[in-house]
Amino acid sequence: MLKIRLKRFGRKRQPSYRIIVIDSRKPRDGRPIEEIGFYSPLNNKSKINLIQVKKRIYQGAQPTKKVQQIISQFEKQN
């Protein structure tokens, strides 16, 4: 099953995340199928390709709770 979830990168105590599509059995920082966005909790910025998100959800990928919240916030801003 495909999941849309966060992949951590950045420095110590300065997390940033990539929003990725990945097989649910793979590790958090494993190789993604596709990268569809970016999220930085420190300055609360995000950039998401909504077309790709909707395409992947239509194909059966399930977003995690946090990713769903980030997508909702991004849609409200734009």
Curated annotation (Swiss-Prot):
Does the entry feature the keyword Plastid, yes or no? yes
**Gene Ontology molecular functions:** structural constituent of ribosome
Q: Which PROSITE patterns match?
A: RIBOSOMAL_S16 (PS00732)
Indicate yes or no for the key word Chloroplast: yes
> Cellular component terms, GO, for this chain's entry?
chloroplast; mitochondrion; small ribosomal subunit
Question: What's in the keyword line of the UniProt record?
Answer: Chloroplast, Plastid, Ribonucleoprotein, Ribosomal protein
- Family statement: Belongs to the bacterial ribosomal protein bS16 family.
The record ties this protein, via NCBIfam families, to: S16
Tell me what this protein is called.
Small ribosomal subunit protein bS16c
